[in-house]
Amino acid sequence: EFETLNTQANNAFKGVDRSVQLYDFSGSNPIEYRSMWEVQKSLVGAHVNRLKVEFQKIAPDTQFMDTDQLQLGASSSSVVGISDYMMIPEQEERIKSFDSLILLQHQPVYTLGTGSDSQFVKLDEERLESLGIDLIRIDRGGEVTYHGPGQLTAYPIFDQRGYKQDIHWYMRALEEAILIALENAGVQGAVREDNVTGVWMNGKKVAALGVKVKRWVTMHGLAVNVDHRSLGNFDGIVPCGLEGRDVGCVNDFLD
């Protein structure tokens, strides 16, 4: 549960409902990674514009992103419709927060964090192409991971000024959210492990985390391996750079 703090840094949010706008594409076709990365950056940009309004007194009609900025082209038709959910000026009175949560499945892709070591990718470029798996270096923390069908990926675009300005707290809160969701789904035995991020079951990693924070606005997030489809391409990498550690999926642990 995210706790709103009443600190001096959060004075601008006193009396403001911290509502979250949900974009749920988890039941749709898997989405190409780069397209949704651009959407994340657009949502973060909208947050930054809002902060300029609140703290620099910029005219209010500049705080809302033009929905045309989210038109991603014909090659990205799998995300057509997300602009319909974007905030526009006439929605100003109804929207209390720019916090957003995107749920989706991705097309097969390996992502490397900013400082990730490419030695943890076992496949060469030719093999990746034959398998139809993209390899992308992105702007999050953490080592290499895999996204694909059968995996629930969540991208919280949250302004931490409305919660707690502590990245370690945020990472633990994401883990806690996964643990609570699994428990509510009847999945028993999910735990944290000391000195490593993520959620584990019977020694296998079922959920991974990797985030970026810009001006205390978060992007990227978490991925939960739900069914066996999510596991097929992990053998092409050393997941999260953890040698000798296995990955698993939630369905293996359902009663």
Predicted regions and their residues:
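Conserved phosphate/anionic-ligand binding catalytic regions in large, soluble enzymes, centered on
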Residues: K214-G232
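Residues immediately flanking
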Residues: H106-Q107, T114, V213, V226-H228
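Short conserved catalytic/interaction loops centered on acidic-Pro-aromatic/His motifs
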Residues: G189-R192, H220, L231-G236
